[in-house]
Amino acid sequence: MPIIGGAVAGGAIALAIASGGSSSKSVTTTVVRPAQQAALPASFSSGKGLTVNQIYRSASPGVVDIIVTAQSSNPASGFFGGSGTQKTQGEGAGVVYDSRGDILTDEHVVAGATSVKVNFQDGRSYSAKVLGTDPSTDVGVIRVSAPASELHPIAFADSSAAQVGDPVVAIGSPFSLPETTTSGIVSQTGRSITAPNNYTIPNAIQTDAAINPGNSGGPLLDASAHVLGLNDQIETNNSTASGQGSSSGVGFAIPSNTVRRIADSIIGGQTVKHAYVGVLLAGNSAGGAEIASVQVGTPGALAGLQANDLITAIDGRAITSTDQFIADIDNYTPGQTVTMTVSRAGQTQNIKVKLGTRPASTPSGG
């Protein structure tokens, strides 16, 4: 369940991580299921003179296919002896970020990798290493040793400017079919999805462009062929035994502003840290973010936050929902102090909270 220093309770639907291979990961989120939008025809124009084909031709040289080999536990070893691990392969996509060979993808694509191979559009392949990952945002960075002629960085868009109805194009490797291109629209913005470590990724972009296993880490492109986000998850009610599902017209991308912020920290050799309050949040409540419980010893507990408190503002900015609270806290860094306006038993009070550093995974018991 989505968590910001805790978790959001109730009302979850299944999401499948959209990477290929034998992964059995699945996550949940509290997004409301909207009516599916019909995908735009391949001849649509963005209004800026770019068709799907033009977007593809502009961006595809900077999209790569990623093949990952990892070690996983071998359930048969206990019965038949031998090694307790086995090699597994997974597949995803990535975006060339700079001329140094840095490629951005999803953390879950490269998690646990023992080897990484990158396939470029011209068919050439090169080995890569994992430079760093952030499970809290599902962002990963790999670096490939390839000649400059292979590296075609794609410009990034400002994801905060995305609007419902904007045309988008997804490129990736669904079902081991590299350079597959699909089109659609931005179905909604500001969604919350669940990261590999069970925290919440705020401001995700929802799209009806077809996203399937193998699309993870590939770009969601705007009408200017700029990266609006990295394709990450799909809603599915028909997951296979491996935990994978197919497109249902409801997909989610990590917003480009989040991707760039995390990637720049990783490439710069910094440790990625996230602000932490330590509260379990109820589902979206009218007029604010309601606290279901407070983790003992956390910044929220030390500041005096209590269960049933309704947070209505942070530093004077109105908070109208749980999702907005999560997104707002994500803009801060550990060590900063914020003033939370809280409604408690009919009384309004301001409580100062010194934000901590988010633990590696959500506390046990939520």
Language model: regions and residue ranges:
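Serine-dependent protease modules
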Residues: 2-287, 296, 303, 317, ...
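Conserved catalytic motifs of ABC-family nucleotide-binding domains
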Residues: 308
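Edge beta-strands of extracellular beta-sandwich domains
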Residues: 351-354
